[in-house]
Amino acid sequence: MEWPDALPSAMVLFPSMFHDSPPDGHCPTFPTADAVFSILQPNHPNGLKAQLTELVASFDASPQNPTLSGATIDESAGPVIVEQSAQIEPGSHLIGPCYVGHHAEIRHAAYVRQFSWICSEAVVGHASETKHSILLPGAKAPHFNYVGDSILGTGVNLGAGTKISNLRNDGGEVHLRMNGERFGSGLRKFGAVLGERCQLGCNSVTNPGVILGCDSQVHPNTTVTGVFPADSRHG
């Protein structure tokens, strides 16, 4: 599937992943020829599902047993892999396959579902839920957040109650809106791609198919739709 050339690439949205020293632990490899959200395609040969399945299979066992910290796990569909330095709080629940990186935090009542890739120093906080998503190093979903079928760049912070909507009400293909035009993503479930250091205020919502460039800000109680460049302001 072809997408407009004007869509921001992974190198534009996540420059530290390409130019800085590699972070501790494991991070996914992003497409450079396809649209950045192609990694969310369920059957993509190098998509999130394929890469995470390969990653968790490379471990003989999880470096940390999260149940010793009071968490519960479900490995009926795949392993739950947690690095030894990660902080896992009581009452959290993790479903495999999933990966939690070095010094990441999974706080009380967090719900980490299948194909969640939580990179080093990322946070899934109290009453927050992730599913088929990537939180790059230092990304935070700390309080009452939902992150589904999405990518949060390094340094992204979601304010309390922020929700990333990933499914249209009619269940149809998610479309992206950019420069007054609308085009299909090829995905039925697609939340948002948030470039590095984006800040979303409390109780904000991103509609399905949002892409925000680096350092964008969303004010509290604001709903965002579309594709926007770096440093955009909403609300």
Give the location of each predicted region.
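Terminal amphipathic alpha-helical/low-complexity segments used for targeting or macromolecular assembly
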Residues: 1-71, 215, 221, 230-232
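Tandem repeat scaffolds
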Residues: 100-103, 118-121, 195
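Conserved short histidine dyad/triad with adjacent acidic residue
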Residues: 62-64, 83, 195
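Short, solvent-exposed loop/turn positions at domain surfaces
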Residues: 74-76, 94, 112, 146, ...
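Glycine-rich active-site/cofactor-binding loop and its immediate structural neighborhood
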Residues: 76-115
